[in-house]
């Protein structure tokens, strides 16, 4: 109900109705008052004219009694006539009740003395009670010299008339006026409602448009064809709505681009306002904040506070959960509406870079060690032979055998480095052929039979000799050689190395399993990384470059397959190779 009363249509309609009603009431009151006054005055003037004529008639008549009777015949109905010579000595015996009361009014009302003493006409309204009801009369006294009077200068002609006819006329006029006013008010009400609806229709459209704009809908643009102020307002509002839509679209596009850029960043990004609340973040930052510990959180808060104080960019290193981060905090003058400042925090995960740098350092150290050892042996044994320290044929033969072994070791190390360099520069190529897998495994069996016996290992090959695979013999030989060498390095006498094959609907599967020392869980995700090496303390004494498993992964992936590892520390390791079946 209140919302309807607050409507512009209702307010305008009620205003028009109130104004028209007020005007009609005032006009009706003025008209009724005027008509009452008019008819009263007309009646009074008519009575006065009658009194004047009677006065003249009686004064000019020789037979005054006949003239009075004649006048009474004319006036008595519906009014009354009295000619009073002396109001103080007037007999009431032959008068009617109304005339008696009229005579009493003349006698007792001092205003009528002016009729007898000054010769003035006097008019008064007199209320007469008769038969339990009251009736109002107009009583007029008119001076005359028709009869001689020793007590006063004038006699009086008094005519009274019932005002009921005037009241009836006034009532009829009042009813007609009220009915006319009601009809006019009804017509005005309908017209005012139509007019107010017509006038406010563009305003209601503008209201609907403003509501839709506030809700983000800029498509509704009502057309107002009027050339008045409302039409101009509508055109201006449509123009404003179009410009707002363009600005909002531009802001939305910018925001979407910004959000996409922020979410696509590998760094975690946080926006912090003056209240130290996060107002902006991307997925990476959310993941980091979900896993942050108390020490790292305190470190981050200290850096943020330092940035607020210094208003300078701060860059610090953070280590958390065995990962390494670089935290950069930058002061921003305006980060929120109202010109409030804040800090943008960028958290970059440098774990891979840190590990790569560490692996490079380890690689340089390992390669230096690997190169120094065979070179030192080569130099020592050759110097012994050249200097004649070793002269016996058997000793010379043993020294040359050591030189040969170390040369092979040095050659293998250099070949691994050259292979990786070649693969980085030229890529890796494989020549797959459909051939029995048994050919490769038989080759491995012959190759490592003596080594297994020397190391005291149980090496078994369980495979289906009739099964054919699609693979490059030389590349797969390189893979298995690397994997079996690794297995031999991480086992001790009595352990077992088993090579078995299997299949599923789309892949051929090869398992290389050992019961050696195994690999710790924190190393499993990095064993295939370039230059990565597991703790050398668990190896048999041979060092490597950390490139073997990296090369194996590249070869298998070039075949269109995959290589995975499962290991449990202290129980052994299993490498799983999956190659697509021949078409």
From Swiss-Prot:
Gene Ontology MF term list: ATP binding; phosphorelay response regulator activity; phosphorelay sensor kinase activity; protein kinase activator activity
GO terms under cellular component: plasma membrane
Source organism: Staphylococcus aureus (strain N315)
Main location: membrane
GO biological process, one term: osmosensory signaling via phosphorelay pathway
Pfam families documented for this protein: HAMP (PF00672), HATPase_c (PF02518), HisK_sensor (PF18698), HisKA (PF00512)
Alphabetized InterPro entries for the sequence: HAMP_dom, HATPase_C_sf, His_kinase_dom, HisK_dim/P_dom, HisK_dim/P_sf, HisK_sensor, Light-responsive_reg, Sig_transdc_His_kin-like_C
Topology with respect to the bilayer: Multi-pass membrane protein
Limits of the HAMP domain: 197-249
Reaction equations catalysed: ATP + protein L-histidine = ADP + protein N-phospho-L-histidine
Residues with Phosphohistidine modification: 369
UniProt name for this protein: Sensor protein SrrB
Organism classification: Bacteria, Bacillati, Bacillota, Bacilli, Bacillales
PROSITE patterns, A to Z: HAMP, HIS_KIN
EC class (word): transferase
